[in-house]
């Protein structure tokens, strides 16, 4: 049985963070050492990013927030809201992106209507709430209330792949299955000022957005499928556990992103790909 990815759509928050402006703010924080300031400039410049989308409107230079929680334009200080405050914003703003991306994926897939969705998989590692995004999507889009719902949480940025793999398995088990996969991350909720290289790298690289896909083995007339989902493989490397991590702290989630990660991938990528190519 052949399983296809029939549509793929994205959604981003409207606020745009300009990279040079963000770099200037983070480099000017009073707690930075000279080395920390140099790291900020290096990481932000070498990221090769011009703009990023953020759900935190007050992170922009022209913010007019009356009671700022993330950035105070009057003093130029990056603030440190609690994890509770950050997660509360996630519950509100992530819901919007989950729903928008899911709606766009449905609209981009002629022949598939909301009641046709049999399985819903949501993915995120930047916040939690319950009833969760799966529930919100069902209600907002009018999905069948009996739809099978699953959430992959806190697996990190690769979680879209096991989500697609699960969708493929559902479709192979049931030829009539149609799976909606929706991923959303609000990384900018967890920005902070620090001299720590991993934290600086996270603040320089990541942003906010969502993506949704519809996967099915059904024969649907109209536009050709975007992708055929043939085979998935996964492998754990013997090293790297301490080089990449994501932990919950008192002032947001804390990233570990060592500069050795590309070398680990380089050393093990061939072995990981061999089962796919054999």
Regions found by a protein language model. Give the residues of each.
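Residues within well-ordered alpha helices
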Residues: 42-43, 105, 137, 276
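Hydrophobic faces of stable alpha-helices that mediate helix-helix packing
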Residues: 95-102, 265-266, 270
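Condensing-enzyme catalytic core mediating Claisen C-C bond formation in acyl metabolism
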Residues: 1-89, 178, 187, 193-267, ...
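Acyl-thioester C-C bond-transforming condensing/cleaving domain
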Residues: 92, 99-116, 125-249
């Amino acid at each position: 049985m052949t399983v296809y990815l029939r549509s793929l759509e994205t959604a981003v928050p409207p606020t745009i963070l300009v990279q040079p402006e963000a770099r200037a703010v983070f480099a000017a924080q009073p707690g930075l050492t000279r080395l920390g300031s140099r790291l900020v400039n290096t990481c932000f410049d070498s990221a090769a990013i011009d703009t990023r989308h953020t759900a935190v409107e007050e992170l922009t230079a022209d913010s007019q927030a009356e009671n700022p929680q993330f950035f105070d334009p009057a003093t130029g200080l990056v603030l440190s809201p609690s994890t509770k405050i950050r997660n509360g914003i996630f519950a509100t703003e992530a819901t919007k992106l989950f729903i928008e991306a899911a709606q766009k994926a449905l609209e981009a897939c002629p022949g598939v209507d909301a009641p046709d969705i049999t399985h819903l998989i949501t993915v995120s590692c930047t916040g939690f709430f319950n009833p969760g995004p799966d529930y919100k999507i069902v209600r907002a889009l009018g999905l069948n209330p009996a739809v099978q719902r699953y959430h992959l949480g806190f697996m990190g940025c690769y979680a879209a792949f096991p989500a697609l793999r699960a969708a493929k398995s559902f479709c192979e088990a049931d030829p009539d299955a149609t799976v909606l996969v929706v991923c959303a991350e609000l990384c900018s909720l967890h920005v902070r000022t620090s001299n720590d290289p991993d934290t600086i790298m996270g603040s320089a690289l990541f942003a906010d957005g969502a993506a949704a896909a519809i996967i099915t083995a059904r024969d649907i007339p109209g536009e050709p499928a975007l992708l055929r989902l043939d085979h998935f493989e996964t492998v754990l490397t013997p090293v790297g556990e301490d080089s990449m991590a994501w932990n919950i702290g008192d002032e947001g989630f804390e990233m570990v992103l060592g500069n050795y990660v590309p070398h680990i991938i380089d050393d093990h990528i061939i072995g990981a790909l061999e089962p796919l190519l054999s």
